[in-house]
């Protein structure tokens, strides 16, 4: 039951992130992509670049901010999932990057959203 609640909460914040990104000109093309490489929360187009988004939410009082919560292991999984997606769809020649969206409760607005472009690099 807790897992289902966590999944719904994750989908809610992915929706918040998608609306934010669309307001900034990103065209969301896929959500919750699962493949052998792992999971990608959102995939979008930023001009000619294919962007893989990791969405993170942290409540007030969390020990770690959302951006810092992306561990080295999670970064490796994201790179693997993005690589698998590019390979599977024949998009190796496409400019791509992995961005992180951090969401926390806002003070003057409902949410505070931080967008780090090219946050994760493949080694």
Curated annotation (Swiss-Prot):
Family to which this protein belongs: Belongs to the UPF0102 family.
HAMAP family: UPF0102
GO molecular function list: nucleic acid binding
Disulfide partners: none
NCBIfam families, per the entry: PRK12497.1-3, YraN family protein
Organism from which the protein derives: Marinobacter nauticus (strain ATCC 700491 / DSM 11845 / VT8) (Marinobacter aquaeolei)
Lineage summary: Bacteria, Pseudomonadati, Pseudomonadota, Gammaproteobacteria, Pseudomonadales
Listed name of the protein: UPF0102 protein Maqu_2464
Classification via SUPFAM superfamilies: Restriction endonuclease-like
């Amino acid at each position: 039951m807790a897992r289902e609640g966590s999944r719904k909460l994750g989908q809610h914040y992915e929706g918040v992130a998608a609306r934010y990104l669309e307001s900034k000109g990103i065209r969301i093309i896929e959500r919750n992509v699962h493949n052998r490489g792992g999971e990608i929360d959102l995939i979008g187009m930023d001009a000619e670049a294919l962007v893989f988004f990791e969405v993170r939410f942290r409540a007030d009082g969390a020990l770690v901010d959302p951006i810092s919560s992306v561990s080295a292991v999670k970064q490796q999984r994201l790179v693997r999932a993005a690589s698998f997606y590019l390979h599977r769809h024949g998009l190796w020649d496409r400019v791509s990057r992995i961005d992180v969206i951090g969401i926390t409760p806002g003070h003057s607005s409902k949410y505070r959203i931080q967008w780090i472009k090219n946050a994760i690099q493949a080694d």
